[in-house]
Amino acid sequence: MPQIKSAMKRVKTIEKANNRNASQLSTMRSAIKKFKAAQAAGNEEAADLLKAATRAIDMASTKGLIHANKAGRDKSRLNKMMAK
């Protein structure tokens, strides 16, 4: 446990950031899973879910939660799934 006041504040700040980042990553993963499930089932709403998943991936990339190359790779794979 930190003894210095500023270090104690940083611990709180880091915990908040970790929670926010975990939530955003979870949202991204959920959006991808929803799209994959809809695509496998052949639902017409898969196109809308693809848009939502792409948006979630872009947000995670913008926030620095995932690398830009991973974001591009994930979006490319989802678009290929949609094309089939």
From Swiss-Prot:
Organism domain of life: Bacteria
GO MF annotation terms: small ribosomal subunit rRNA binding; structural constituent of ribosome
A Gene Ontology biological process term: translation
SUPFAM superfamilies: Ribosomal protein S20
Role of this protein: Binds directly to 16S ribosomal RNA.
Family in the record: Belongs to the bacterial ribosomal protein bS20 family.
Name the UniProt record assigns to this protein: Small ribosomal subunit protein bS20
Annotated organism of origin: Latilactobacillus sakei subsp. sakei (strain 23K)
Organism classification: Bacteria, Bacillati, Bacillota, Bacilli, Lactobacillales
Gene name as annotated: rpsT
